[in-house]
Every structure is written in C-alpha cells, then in structure tokens.
Amino acid sequence: MRQNFFCIILAITQGIHTMTEFSTPDTEQIKSHGLTPDIVAQQLADFVRGFPYANITRPATVGDGITELSDPDIARYTEKYIAAQKTKKIVKFVPASGAATRMFRDLFEFLNTGTENDTTRRVLDNLDKFAFWDDLRQFLPATPTDRDKIACILTDAGLNYGNLPKGLIAFHKYDTYSRTALEEHLAEGAQYATANGTVHIHFTVSPEHLAGFRALLARTVPEYSARYGVNYDITMSNQRTSTDTIAVNPDNTPFRTDDGHLLFRPAGHGALIENLNDIDADIVFIKNIDNVTTDKLRGDTIKYKRALAGLLVCLQSRAFEYLNNFTAHDLNEIRTFITNDLCVRVPDDASADTLRQILNRPIRVCGMVKNIGAPGGGPFWVRDENGTESLQIIESSQIAPDARDIMNASSHFNPVDLVCGTRDAHGNKFDLGRFIDPQTGFISDKSYGGRNLRAMERPGLWNGAMAHWNTVFVAVPASTFTPAKVVTDLLSPSHGAK
C-alpha cells in the first residue's frame, strides 16, 4: 500500500503565518503546473494578506505627465523611427488568448433563455451589415427563426463564434471580401512595423485555438505578403501553466474540486510578461487583438505608432549615452533628464547610484486617450516607499476608496497602446521579471461548479508587471482606439459599418 506523504510548508510573509499541508498527489499536481509547493504557499499567504492599494498622488494630465505632440514633434520622431527601422528588430506583440464569450454575452442570454435584449434585437435587425453575414447565411435554413440565426452565430451549428477567440472572427467588410481581426493586424503591421522588409508579429494564443490560428495564417499570409510587398515572420506562444495561481475558498483555504484536486486558474494578462520576456527585439509594439480598424481609417494609428516609437528611440539614445559615459556628465543634467523626460521625480538627496539605476531600466512609451467613458485603467502619478514619484497605469481595483476623487479627476484612460524598449545600453535583453512589483496583484470573487471561490491575478501586463519600467505617456487621438468589446461595436463607423 502506497504511503501518502505530506509536504508541510510554512509561509511567513509580513507577519502572516500560514501552515499549509500538501499531500503527495497535491505536490505532483503542483509540479505538473511548473510550480513548487513554496510558490503555492506564498500565493495562499497573499490571499490572507491581500495586496496594498497604489499610492496615487494625482492623475497624469496634459502638461503634468502626459505629453501632447505637436506636428513638428510628430515629424521629427517619425524620421527617427524610420531610420531605426533600417537597423533595429521590431516585433508587434498581440495578446490574443481566450474565447470571445463576453463579446457575445447578450446573444448567449437570448439563446439560453429566449428573452430578447437590446443587443440581440440590434444584431438581428442588422445581420446583413456584419462582415460575417455571407458566411453565416450559408448555415441558415430557408426560413430561419431568430433563434436559428443566433444559434448559427454562436454554436457549431454555424460559425461557432461563441467558442472562438476574437482573432478568428470576421470584423470588417470590404468590397469583395471580409477580414478577421487577425488579418487586420497583418495589414496594420505591414504599415508601421516592418524592419528590412519583414514584419515580425507574435500572438499569444490559447492551446485550444492554435490550430485555428495556424490554418487562418496559412491561408492569408501569402495574400498579405503580396499585397504589401513584405515578408511575415509570425510566431505564437501560450500562457504558461507555471503562471497559474491556486484558487481558494472564501476562508482562504485551498479550493478543491469534487474529485479532491486543487484548482489552478490562469492568472490574467499579467502572466504574459513571461511571453514578452522571450521576445528578442529592439522595439516591441503591444496592442490588443480587438483594437483594429479598416484600411481607410488607419491613418492616425500609423501616424502615432511611428511617432511613439521615434520618441522611444530618442529616449533610449539619451539614456544609453548617460549610462555609457556616466562620469562625463553633470549629475544635475542627468537628474533633469530623468525628471523631465523619463517622468521620474526622485528625492533631492538621491545618490548617483540611484540615478544610474533609474537609467538602466526598460522604457515604454504609452498612448493615452482622452476619457470618453471607455473602461480601462488610467494614467496616474504614484509615490513609492522611498518618496520617488513615477508614472503608472493603475486599475480602479488598485485605488483606495478614499482616493476615488483622484481617480474621478483623471482626464485620460489606457487604450493599451504601448511601444517598448527591452534592451539595455549594451544591447542585451533585460530580464523583465526584475521589474515586476509583486505587490500589485488582484483578488476577485469567482465561482466554479456553483461554488464560490477567490481567484488571484498576477500584476497586470501593463500595470504591476511593468511597474519598475521607465514610463512616458503621450496623448493620442480617440481614432486610434477602436476595440470590439461587444458584438454591436462592429456596427460602429470605426469598424467601417455604413
């Protein structure tokens, strides 16, 4: 008879003692995720302790943390970027994991309950305006009911969109064909992310959708390569199970499934910092899979992507010059650059070593859109325990109730429009794991099999996972932010609907 050994872990974190017993099967399950009992015990301690609120001091606004580019600025930075395209490796990084379930939530409600809602009615009244109409009608019976139409959109009786990721959904209708969100990224990448004639695009994809992405790419890449006169280098990766976090009961004890197993959950987009860390590039553009528009409306996107990248190149160039010739420069000159250009405000007594350390970080230039009621995090000034103020993208869940007035005064929001420099002054890749603030995770209430649980997300990719980067915010027009969060967004003018 096999002996059932127990691994007992004592996690001691900021005065919190958590004794956790893991059985041999538990330990084997933990290791199968690429985790260790110590890591899981630390996660359990984090549930007990919670995560502190961000110490926001004020919102970033134009003139105080957000730069507004003039036409001469845009021209100058664009010229810098075009020059960099000749010598730099450029990658477009597109988070594209997960099914589009939320995009079709109201349609699922109608399908499951028969209760019509405004979204469903609008979809049914405008079916022929969607890019997927020609594909959809091939599945419809001769005299389809409303339920037939919705079922053929969502289920494998038709398009099966309810089980597909957004990247594989037809977003835009052109004169003789339609394009998926993935195809729009191919087109977009060819227009600003080329380097020596090649477009490098990396998609993060769920394992169950890899085959679908590969099939679509095999059909479309040759077409777009010929259309734009470029070569494509497309790579894909999965969110690693080693970034999963354990789920707990409401009393913070490990949640177990009906068969007694521990439950691990994907830890949110912050886990993708490991995928980003694997990217070998000088310049990385980051943009979500659903934030695309049509060829005719893409002008502002191309214009500002180039300008933001050129600004990044200029900031890197100066930071590298200071690092490589640190003693040759006056410390006040370096401090002024750090304060005015890198937007890091250090205490007056900050040492030369502190200034050098600040220069030696990854840099990101982030577009910020004026508030129009869209969801998403916002740009804020945040003060750390050493008194240093820097710019951060902060989610509402990170803001204390008594700081809501500061949050409500925010003028801009985060559209996830990042241009990143991940090499150091010697051309070596930074280890991005060194620049995460582990105390910026999220805990939320979820359910599994009808039972309540608590889930933990790692620090968000553009939030705590980049907390110790140098961050610069630039105002960009709302025309660069055209996501499809719900299916009826595809009927908006920004998606080419007429």
Region spans (language model):
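N-terminal regions that are enriched for targeting/export leaders
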Residues: 20-62, 76
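Short linear interaction motif-like sites in intrinsically disordered regions of transcription factors
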Residues: 2-3, 134
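Short, Lys/Arg-enriched N-terminal segments with co-localized hydrophobic residues
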Residues: 3-18
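Domain-scale recognition of functional cores that engage charged ligands
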Residues: 30-31, 56-372, 381-401, 458, ...
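Primarily single-stranded nucleic-acid-binding OB-fold modules
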Residues: 342-364, 373-382, 388-394, 403-498
